[in-house]
Amino acid sequence: MLILGHPLIPSARFVFIKNTDGIHSSANNDIVCFEAHPKNLELAKYCCENGVHFSVIFLSHKIETNTFFLFNAFKPLYCIFKDIKQAILAQQHATNYLLDSKILFSMDLNDTESWEICAKSQIDGVISKDSLLLK
């Protein structure tokens, strides 16, 4: 299981962006991230075509299956979920379709119940909710 955002475990810096200007102002080793909204598909395409490492954050409690697969066509490093049920569903899709993107659940890393749910559900990894400013 991947563990991102823990103070004792080194990981890349996640930078929330809203447009290509945000990409240009980020460092080369940053992972840019943005909301999984259809209006951001062009941003995902830009990242894919230009070799920019990016992640997509699914903020909704109801994942739109088409949105999930459309974003995955552009090969994000991570798909990050704040809703555990959506993370579990996405992990099933990622496993069944052999997607390259890793599924992460955004959580309080001190929440032992969430750790158990993620482990039992075989979620690819977790990310500290403090690493990202999720709405």
Model segments located where?
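Conserved N-terminal beta1-alpha1 strand-loop-helix module at the mouth
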Residues: M1-L77
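Structural signal for conserved beta-strand scaffold positions within catalytic alpha/beta enzyme cores
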Residues: G5, F16, F105-S106, I127
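N-terminal donor/sugar-recognition subdomains of glycan-related enzymes
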Residues: N19, D130-S131
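Short, surface-exposed beta-strand/loop "edge" segments at domain boundaries and coil↔beta transitions
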Residues: H24, L41-E42, E113, L133-K135
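Glycine-rich beta-to-alpha transition loops that act as phosphate-gripper elements at the mouths
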Residues: E35-P38, F58-K62, Y78-I84, I103-T112, ...
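Glycine-enriched alpha-helix->loop->beta-strand junction motifs that scaffold or abut catalytic
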Residues: E49-F54, F68-L77, H93-F105, K120-V126
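Catalytic cores of alpha/beta
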Residues: N66-F68, I84-A94, N110-D124, S128, ...
